[in-house]
């Protein structure tokens, strides 16, 4: 191998270039690459965090929807129960009112029947007295007696 001055000059230039690159170019380049790697890592971490938050939010939404469905079903059941109770109460009130009206009608019918019996008794008593008067006014014989009884029957 031939070692001459050119070779040594090239080595000196190479080391100077290496020193300049190592001193002025390499640190900013490494810094830029590190910053880029950090931004990428931060972006991936933010994406993972966002994904986890999205899953958590979806779980909360699903839970809230389930609670809303349960609450809605409970409200519907309560409303149906109240409606049934109200319907039963209305039915009982209607039955009680019907029983009251029937009892009142029976009482009125009995009162009318009692009044009719009393009126009939009064009329029968009056007729009996009239019949007795007529019998006593006339002479008592069988033919007159039969005629008076027939007349009383006709009046009744």
From Swiss-Prot:
Transmembrane residues, as ranges?
7-27
Instruction: Please state the protein's primary subcellular location.
Output: membrane
List the signal peptide residues. none
Q: SUPFAM superfamilies attached here?
A: F1F0 ATP synthase subunit B, membrane domain (SSF81573)
What family does this belong to? Belongs to the ATPase B chain family.
Instruction: Describe, as the record does, how this protein assembles with itself and its partners.
Output: F-type ATPases have 2 components, F(1) - the catalytic core - and F(0) - the membrane proton channel. F(1) has five subunits: alpha(3), beta(3), gamma(1), delta(1), epsilon(1). F(0) has three main subunits: a(1), b(2) and c(10-14). The alpha and beta chains form an alternating ring which encloses part of the gamma chain. F(1) is attached to F(0) by a central stalk formed by the gamma and epsilon chains, while a peripheral stalk is formed by the delta and b chains.
Instruction: Enumerate the HAMAP family for this protein.
Output: ATP_synth_b_bprime (MF_01398)
The protein's name: ATP synthase subunit b
Organism from which the protein derives: Cupriavidus taiwanensis (strain DSM 17343 / BCRC 17206 / CCUG 44338 / CIP 107171 / LMG 19424 / R1) (Ralstonia taiwanensis (strain LMG 19424))
| Record gene name | atpF
């Amino acid at each position: 191998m031939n070692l001459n001055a050119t070779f040594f000059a090239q080595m000196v230039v190479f080391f100077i270039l290496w020193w300049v690159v190592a001193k002025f170019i390499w640190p900013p380049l490494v810094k830029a690459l590190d910053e880029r790697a950090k931004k990428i890592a931060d972006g991936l971490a933010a994406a993972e965090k966002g994904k986890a938050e999205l899953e958590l939010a979806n779980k909360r939404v699903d839970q809230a929807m389930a609670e809303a469905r349960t609450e809605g079903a409970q409200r519907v059941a309560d409303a149906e129960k109240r409606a049934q109770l109200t319907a039963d109460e209305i039915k009982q009130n209607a039955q009680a009112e019907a029983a009251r009206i029937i009892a009142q009608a029976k009482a009125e019918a009995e009162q009318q029947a009692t009044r009719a019996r009393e009126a009939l008794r009064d009329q029968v008593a009056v007729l009996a007295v009239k019949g007795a008067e007529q019998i006593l006014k006339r002479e008592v014989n069988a033919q007159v007696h039969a005629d008076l009884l027939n007349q009383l029957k006709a009046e009744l």
